[in-house]
UniProtKB/Swiss-Prot annotation:
SMART domains: GatB_Yqey. Belongs to the GatB/GatE family. GatB subfamily. It is an enzyme of class 6 (ligase). This is Aspartyl/glutamyl-tRNA(Asn/Gln) amidotransferase subunit B. Its EC number is 6.3.5.-. Keywords: ATP-binding, Ligase, Nucleotide-binding, Protein biosynthesis. The keyword ATP-binding applies. The keyword Ligase applies. Heterotrimer of A, B and C subunits. Gene3D superfamilies: 1.10.10.410, GatB domain, N-terminal subdomain.
Length: 487
């Protein structure tokens, strides 16, 4: 990257739209379910029929409160709804019901690790609103599916507290993990359950000025978010450098863009609307939402352990490496799998490696998640215990892991009973004979070892393990080999 670019920094804030996993929609009894036939989960309310009146979904309110508790936000005892007016085919009422002036949540923060450092990303607010329908294009015409119209959302608005793409991705990743842990959304980004609108501007480093921002709409991939932020950063910096004498306010107009992953560039959709353009006014068909501290406290008591707290506990209780702990807590189901396995295996570091590396790699190849593969936590724990006790070698353990993937209902113990030929070598005289043969076949390695080249020892061990098909106990191989070499 040009040194000139290094003199600039991004200023980034995110608006995250999260579909709540309620049974019904926000203001009607229509089902909230993804993937059904178009226009089957609809009602007069979500299709904007004359005379239909909204009724607020209590479950959606509870989930918004739970989110507030998870991020240490302030829950408003009094909040209200407003109409946001705009015309678009996927909005049959020509307005959205949202919370413009009095949101249910203010403040709070999300904790994340960025480049090895703990960061607190501050939130401005979170508010409840309903989703729009979906336009579906078919060649020369388009149809509208209103199944999504009226689905409850919380829109989580961060402060402009991120200054590079790494910050934004770390925040977004931590936020999605937190949402998944507290169970208020299925967090399926491919299905649009979580969508990111990214606001970004740039400024010279050291400046406190907030210049005109650009919004990049509807991102549902962390990788695309990082690419879009970097591309937009470069575009804006170049525009300012090409127009040094212009008022910065006129160089980058406020606008809405989308990310084109094929062209690797942001594409203009429209110039930015002002708040007045939406003609906000109080929703007349809904009363003020009133809550009590006791009601909020009851919901707060249902909070599970949050991902960052779990991460810290894994470092403290299990003495795991930071990167391994981060991988484990990134998926609550994998974290639960690991914790169940720790009840039967106390070699936590080895166990975490088998969960996050060995089995995770095998599962990825097959498009599976270990937590739903059918393999039991007790099976992985038993495998690690067998290695520690010398019942099997690491090489045999990997072969057993392959067989567990094929037959997830079988434990390592069962697999060994069915395949006794997999058991390690127990005939030490045979092992000594093989070691002697390897030494005789590799005289140069023996000379190298005796002249201080330690890599030669590793080569000889590798040859022995190869000859024994990985069945020789590694500790005994080393012990016997050293004795034979010293003769």
């Amino acid at each position: 990257m040009s040194d000139v670019y290094a003199d600039w920094e991004s200023v980034i804030g995110l608006e995250v739209h999260v579909e709540l996993n309620t049974k019904s929609k926000l203001f009607s009894s229509a089902q909230n379910r993804f993937g059904d036939e178009p226009n089957t989960n609809i009602s007069p309310v979500c299709t904007g029929m004359p005379g239909s009146l909204p009724v607020l979904n209590k479950e959606a309110v509870n989930k918004a409160i739970l989110f507030a508790c998870a991020v240490q936000g302030e829950v408003a005892l009094l909040s209200r709804f407003d109409r946001k007016s705009y015309f678009y085919p996927d909005s049959p009422r020509n307005f959205q019901i949202t919370q413009f002036e009095h949101p249910i949540v203010r403040g709070g923060y999300v904790k994340a690790i960025v480049r090895g450092e703990e960061r607190y990303f501050e939130l401005a607010q979170a508010h409840i609103e309903d989703d729009a329908g979906m336009l579906k294009h078919f060649g020369e015409f388009a149809g509208v599916d209103y199944n999504r119209a009226g689905v409850p959302l919380i829109e989580i608005v961060s402060k402009p507290c991120m200054f590079c793409a790494d910050d934004a991705v770390a925040y977004a990743t931590a936020l999605v993990s937190l949402l998944d842990y507290i169970g208020i959304s299925d967090c399926n980004m491919e299905e649009g359950s979580v969508r990111f609108d990214v606001n970004v501007s740039v400024r010279p480093k050291g400046s406190e000025e907030l210049r005109n921002k650009v919004e990049i709409k509807n991102m549902n991939s962390f990788a695309f978010m990082a690419q879009a932020l970097e591309a937009e950063r470069c575009r804006q910096i170049e525009a300012y450098l090409e127009n040094p004498n212009k008022d910065p306010k006129t160089v980058i107009p406020g606008a809405t863009y989308r990310w084109d992953p094929e062209k690797k560039k942001t594409v203009l959709m429209r110039l930015k609307e002002r708040a007045e353009d939406y003609k906000y006014f109080i929703e007349p068909d809904l009363p003020v939402l009133q809550l009590t501290e006791a009601y909020i406290d009851d919901i707060r008591k249902t909070l599970p352990e949050l991902p960052y707290d779990k991460y810290q506990r894994y470092l403290r209780e299990y003495a795991l490496a930071e990167d391994i702990a981060a991988i484990l807590i990134s998926d609550k189901h994998i974290a639960n799998f690991f914790e169940l396995a720790t009840k039967e295996c106390k070699n936590y570091r080895a166990l975490s490696n088998w969960v996050t590396v060995e089995f995770a790699g095998r599962c990825k190849t097959q498009g599976k998640n270990l937590a739903f593969s059918g393999i039991l936590p007790s099976g992985v724990a038993q495998l690690v215990n067998f290695i520690d006790k010398g019942v099997i070698t690491g090489k045999i353990a990997k072969d057993i892991a392959d067989m567990m993937m094929e037959s997830p209902d079988k434990s390592p113990e069962v697999i060994l009973k069915e395949n006794p030929e997999m058991l390690p070598m127990t005939d030490e005289s045979a092992l000594v004979a093989i070691i002697s043969e390897v030494i005789s076949a590799n005289p140069q390695s023996v000379v190298d070892y005796k002249s201080g080249k330690t890599k030669a020892l590793g080569f000889l061990v590798g040859q022995i393990m190869k000859r024994t098909q990985g069945k020789a106990p590694p500790n005994r191989v080393n012990e016997i080999l050293l004795v034979e070499l010293d003769k």
